[in-house]
């Protein structure tokens, strides 16, 4: 299966896919909470940094680009600060073709999340969910008609923010049918019939439950709900995402299948549905079956939920995750060339890149402290891991205790780690020079002058962070205690 899915990713590369839907700006305000307000029983967030990125249908398009396809994003934004910020982000991202209509008098949908310690404290939404004007509909239909020919798939990403009117949905459905283009819809609300004869309808469990007025907690209940929905809808197939329970789906043959998710510690579910939608389209664009599409979506979303913010997933990450069986996977371990490309995509999205390194032979609280502190100073954290040969040269012939693959697997499973690379040199200097992180973090009694790569990072305006050691915790001490029993 893994080689088949990897082949689909390769065949889908460069294919043109249209994505139409509600475009929004996702803003994350990060800080620290260490006291309660004297004015009211609410936490006080001490602001540290902010990050903004395209969300909704725009995040679907970003995921398509990250997976190697050529997306065309079609939607609308307002003539306001949030809309201008979105357009500015798009101007810097050459992987997307953006066709946005400016809806006069209508705000750009903005979701502002306040985050501390990896947890969302509050979300503030700015939006107008009324249907867009007839003039906006006309512009969008015209764009669709011009852009659709030659596309490998069309995606509908509905967040119920007013863009996907009944008229626009009918136009999309007719266009896809006339041009024989696969049509995939991520619906919102209870009325699934309004999406017409789509090839794949992808609700989540809550949406499907509301549409059929039936609980779907178990596989049996999910099967009943899927059969009932398919019997009453013109859709050819329905896929329901069920969070930790994985995905259940039904095709035209009426058979229901259940696929377990790829277990991984969940850090943030923001945008995971967008990632799975993009993966479905990628599989279809690559000539895959419904089953292929489901398995690729599971692999992609399993990686996405292990990342903070509205995250994208690359083809290289999926291939790495597919290459190893088991619950941990290797979604974070990439060859250096692939990691350089991933870092470039993160940076193009306006994300702050952090780097730390070490042998991480036997993971202990001191390691965890450094990694968590490193992640607190950036949006995406890459960990450089000394290879087995490098550890032997530095620590002696009896080290490492755990080989590089085992150490990489453990690091990749941590929610604070977004990527892992293995370097064979004695220092990470070459890796730092190649990745150009914005933040370089080191644990221990270091000075700025003694940290390898500090000059490279500071030369491009980056930050150096030194995390104090946790007393009594080191791999050497753990090994000594195991030998003496003390």
Curated annotation (Swiss-Prot):
Entry keyword annotation includes Nucleotidyltransferase: yes
- PROSITE patterns to which the protein is assigned, alphabetical: PFKB_KINASES_1 (PS00583), PFKB_KINASES_2 (PS00584)
Q: Where, in this chain's numbering, is ATP bound? A: 204-207
**What reaction is this protein's catalytic activity?**
D-glycero-beta-D-manno-heptose 7-phosphate + ATP = D-glycero-beta-D-manno-heptose 1,7-bisphosphate + ADP + H(+); D-glycero-beta-D-manno-heptose 1-phosphate + ATP + H(+) = ADP-D-glycero-beta-D-manno-heptose + diphosphate
Enzyme Commission number(s) = 2.7.1.167, 2.7.7.70
Q: Does the keyword Hydrolase apply?
A: no
A cellular-component GO term for this protein: cytosol
A GO molecular function annotation here is: heptose-1-phosphate adenylyltransferase activity
Q: Which residues form the active site?
A: 274
Query: Record's superkingdom?
Result: Bacteria
Quote the InterPro entries the UniProt record gives: Bifunc_HldE, Carboh/pur_kinase_PfkB_CS, Cyt_trans-like, PfkB_dom, RfaE_dom_I, RfaE_dom_II, Ribokinase-like, Rossmann-like_a/b/a_fold
Q: Which GO terms describe its biological process?
A: ADP-L-glycero-beta-D-manno-heptose biosynthetic process
Query: Pathway, per Swiss-Prot/TrEMBL?
Result: Nucleotide-sugar biosynthesis; ADP-L-glycero-beta-D-manno-heptose biosynthesis; ADP-L-glycero-beta-D-manno-heptose from D-glycero-beta-D-manno-heptose 7-phosphate: step 1/4; Nucleotide-sugar biosynthesis; ADP-L-glycero-beta-D-manno-heptose biosynthesis; ADP-L-glycero-beta-D-manno-heptose from D-glycero-beta-D-manno-heptose 7-phosphate: step 3/4
HAMAP family tied to this protein: HldE
Q: How does it assemble?
A: Homodimer.
According to its UniProt entry, the function of this protein is described as: Catalyzes the ADP transfer from ATP to D-glycero-beta-D-manno-heptose 1-phosphate, yielding ADP-D-glycero-beta-D-manno-heptose.
Q: State the protein's name.
A: Bifunctional protein HldE
Which organism is the protein's source? Answer: Hyphomonas neptunium (strain ATCC 15444)
């Amino acid at each position: 299966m893994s080689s088949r899915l990897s082949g689909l990713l390769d065949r889908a590369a460069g294919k043109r896919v249209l994505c139409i839907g509600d475009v929004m700006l996702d803003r994350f305000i990060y800080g620290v909470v260490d006291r309660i307000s004297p004015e009211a029983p609410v936490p006080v967030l001490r602001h540290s940094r902010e990050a903004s990125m395209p969300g909704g249908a725009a995040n679907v398009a970003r995921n398509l680009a990250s997976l190697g396809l050529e997306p065309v994003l079609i939607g609308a934004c307002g003539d306001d600060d949030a809309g201008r910020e979105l357009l500015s982000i798009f101007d810097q991202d050459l992987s997307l073709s953006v066709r946005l209509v400016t809806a006069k008098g209508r705000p750009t949908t903005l979701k502002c999340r306040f985050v501390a310690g990896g947890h969302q404290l509050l979300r503030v939404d700015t939006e107008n969910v009324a249907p867009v004007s007839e003039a906006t509909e006309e512009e969008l239909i015209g764009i669709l008609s011009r852009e659709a020919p030659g596309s490998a798939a069309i995606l509908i990403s509905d967040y119920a923010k007013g863009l996907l009117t009944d008229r626009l949905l009918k136009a999309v459905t007719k266009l896809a049918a006339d041009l024989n283009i696969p049509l995939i819809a991520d619906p919102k609300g209870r009325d699934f019939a309004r999406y017409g004869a789509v090839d794949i309808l992808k609700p989540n469990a809550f949406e499907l439950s509301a549409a059929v007025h039936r609980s779907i907690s178990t596989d049996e209940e999910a099967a009943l709900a899927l059969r009932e929905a398919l019997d009453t809808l013109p859709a050819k197939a329905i896929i329901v995402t069920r969070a930790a329970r994985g995905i259940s789906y039904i095709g035209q043959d009426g058979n229901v299948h259940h696929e377990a998710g790829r277990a991984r510690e969940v850090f943030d579910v923001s945008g995971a549905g967008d990632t799975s939608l993009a993966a479905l389209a990628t599989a279809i664009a690559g000539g895959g079956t419904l089953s292929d599409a489901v398995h690729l979506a599971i692999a992609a979303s399993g990686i996405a939920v292990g990342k903070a913010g509205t995250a994208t997933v690359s083809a290289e990450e999926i291939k790495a995750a597919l290459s190893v069986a088991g619950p941990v996977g290797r979604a974070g371990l990439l060859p250096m060339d692939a990691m350089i490309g991933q870092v470039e995509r993160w940076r193009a999205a306006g994300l702050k890149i952090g780097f730390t390194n070490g042998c991480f032979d036997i993971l202990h609280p001191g390691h965890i402290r450094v990694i968590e502190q490193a992640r607190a100073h950036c949006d995406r954290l890459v960990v450089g891991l000394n290879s087995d040969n490098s550890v032997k040269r530095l620590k002696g012939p009896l080290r490492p205790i755990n080989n590089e693959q085992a150490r990489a697997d453990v690091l990749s499973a941590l929610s604070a780690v977004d990527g892992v690379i293995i370097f064979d040199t004695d220092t990470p200097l070459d890796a730092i020079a190649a990745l150009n992180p914005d933040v370089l973090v080191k644990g221990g009694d270091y000075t700025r002058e003694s940290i390898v790569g500090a000059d490279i990072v500071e030369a491009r305006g980056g930050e150096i962070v030194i995390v104090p050691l946790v007393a009594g915790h080191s791999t050497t001490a753990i090994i000594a205690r195991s030998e003496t029993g003390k």
